[in-house]
Regions:
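Short, flexible helix-loop junctions that flank or precede catalytic/ligand sites
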Residues: 4-165
Length: 168
């Protein structure tokens, strides 16, 4: 089910009564999902009591494994990847040959999901009850080990799977 304003509170109340509710909500991050529910009129205490976790996801293009070219990252790519030392050697895989049979010459073969998984911990529940903004919620989640979408994309870039950081 995709949550809309008028059904958000019904979904939250159903989860409080023991029903497993799995839904979609279009936001830019896991933390923004919490604040979006509040913006829809769901009370903070209901959100804190009902949400056990949030997963944000994006699909990014996968560099073709058959023709992708491994090369050293440019200074700009290193900056995007968060590499502070510009002299550090970092390899990335970029789209390859136009004659590739596997990808039809596009340099990309399929898509792969990147994920941000935010379990709602006790600290996060308290922050939700206080009505904290998405930035504060994300900081709390990060202290409990959450990886952001950007961190996930960087991990895939360093492993040579994608270079689609611009979309994150």
């Amino acid at each position: 089910m995709c949550i809309r304003d008028r059904t958000a509170e019904i979904a939250v109340k159903a989860s409080i009564t023991g029903h497993l509710v799995v839904s979609t909500l279009h936001t830019n991050s896991s933390a923004n999902t919490i604040t979006r529910l509040a913006d829809m009129g769901v009370e903070n205490y209901l959100i804190a009591d009902s949400v056990v976790g949030v997963i944000a996801q994006r699909l990014v293009r996968r560099v073709c494994p058959a023709c992708g070219i491994v090369r050293e990252a440019t200074a700009g790519e290193k900056k995007i990847l968060g590499i502070k030392d510009p002299t550090r050697r970092i390899n990335v895989r970029t789209p390859g040959h136009k004659e590739c049979v596997r990808c039809g010459g596009t340099g990309y073969y399929g898509r792969i999901g990147i994920y941000e998984i935010m379990p709602v911990t006790a600290d996060l529940r308290q922050a939700i009850n206080r009505g904290e903004n998405a930035d504060v919620l994300e900081e709390i989640a990060l202290t409990h080990g959450m990886k952001t979408l950007r961190m996930s994309a960087i991990d895939y870039a360093l492993r040579g799977i994608t270079l689609s950081l611009i979309h994150i």
